[in-house]
Amino acid sequence: MIKKVTIEKIKSPERFLEVPLLTKEEVGQAIDKVIRQLELNLDYFKEDFPTPATFDNVYPIMDNTEWTNGFWTGELWLAYEYSQQDAFKNIAHKNVLSFLDRVNKRVELDHHDLGFLYTPSCMAEYKINGDGEAREATLKAADKLIERYQEKGGFIQAWGDLGKKEHYRLIIDCLLNIQLLFFAYQETGDQKYYDIAESHFYASANNVIRDDASSFHTFYFDPETGQPFKGVTRQGYSDDSCWARGQSWGVYGIPLTYRHLKDESCFDLFKGVTNYFLNRLPKDHVSYWDLIFNDGSDQSRDSSATAIAVCGIHEMLKHLPEVDADKDIYKHAMHAMLRSLIEHYANDQFTPGGTSLLHGVYSWHSGKGVDEGNIWGDYYYLEALIRFYKDWNLYW
């Protein structure tokens, strides 16, 4: 069961309803800009990968060792599906072979981000063309992910030595990573994958989401008893603030998981989390990096959080009952957010190694990628555009 959370009424819905809906032509033009950038980046990265965030809006080149590399490959698959250019497919497949090698050698995989790595890269290729090596890599990644499952508390431990008190926590981001396990269940019929994903989802829904439908970034459990302990931040402004990207992981992770659980209490959880996010957007509909900030705060936006939220709202609109009073507002809100990203945050400099989406934040506390592009922002921006452009078979 999912606990009851506050569902705020959407404030001033006319701020979304008055924005014209995007046309297919407008979306197509925005995708064409991204494709132009990716064509430059293909030659720039070749078979290597971008770093998580840019420096002066250009990505340095790195090996396949970060938690973010799957988003680059996911961009290539999206670009291939749209353009049918073999150049995108060929490099994306070479990336997939690199991911297979990485999981076989267990290179920098002792964390929960296996889904971010293997879903938009390997699972994507398998869904597109049935590639056997892509399937093999995806299932091996799922097996690696369930090694982090903690019976006491019923969750996937995010980082650090397994079972250690100082690391005994989940994070809201993992709502996206557990989609890897639902895929493994569908492919193998092995119930353990489903059960672990389900358990982690409910542990997250009932703990990392606060009663007011805002979210902690991370939540600790007692390793001796498995009882919930406390929520703290790692990327947000403070322990009691609401990190924008974390909230958007909730906006997207809930509908993705609903597809498998069919638990209709997900609807109210989604509405609570999403309405909280929408009510804290500034005038241009693109969130600051923490939702305690708004217009006049002199803080950085996180465009990636808004791109993720657009994808989440788009996904849940497939499932919400037609009689839901907010359904039309959600539709207009996602259009308003994506329109703002297209018109004010899309990069049109077309530099080799450049980002597609400006004004993101990687880690404010660490001073990394503040007011820069980041590779998940680029990915989810393109995914949102593709969602609006065509009937897309999602990778997640």
From Swiss-Prot:
It holds the Pfam family Glyco_hydro_88. It catalyses: beta-D-4-deoxy-Delta(4)-GlcpA-(1->3)-beta-D-GalpNAc6S + H2O = N-acetyl-beta-D-galactosamine 6-sulfate + 5-dehydro-4-deoxy-D-glucuronate. GO terms for biological process: polysaccharide catabolic process. Keywords: Hydrolase. Transmembrane segments: none annotated. The active site is at residues 113, 173. Belongs to the glycosyl hydrolase 88 family. Monomer. Optimum pH is 5.5. Optimum temperature is 37 degrees Celsius. Its EC number is 3.2.1.180. Catalyzes the hydrolysis of unsaturated hyaluronate and chondroitin disaccharides. Also degrades unsaturated heparin disaccharides. Releases 4-deoxy-4,5-didehydro D-glucuronic acid or 4-deoxy-4,5-didehydro L-iduronic acid from chondroitin disaccharides, hyaluronan disaccharides and heparin disaccharides and cleaves both glycosidic (1->3) and (1->4) bonds. Prefers sulfated glycosaminoglycans compared to unsulfated glycosaminoglycans. Probably required for mammalian cells invasion through the degradation of extracellular sulfated glycosaminoglycans such as chondroitin and hyaluronan. PANTHER family: HYDROLASE, PUTATIVE (AFU_ORTHOLOGUE AFUA_7G05090)-RELATED (PTHR36845:SF1). This is Unsaturated chondroitin disaccharide hydrolase. Substrate binds at residues 113, 173, 231, 233, 245, 249, 363, 366. One of its GO terms (molecular function) is unsaturated chondroitin disaccharide hydrolase activity. It comes from the Bacteria. The gene is ugl.
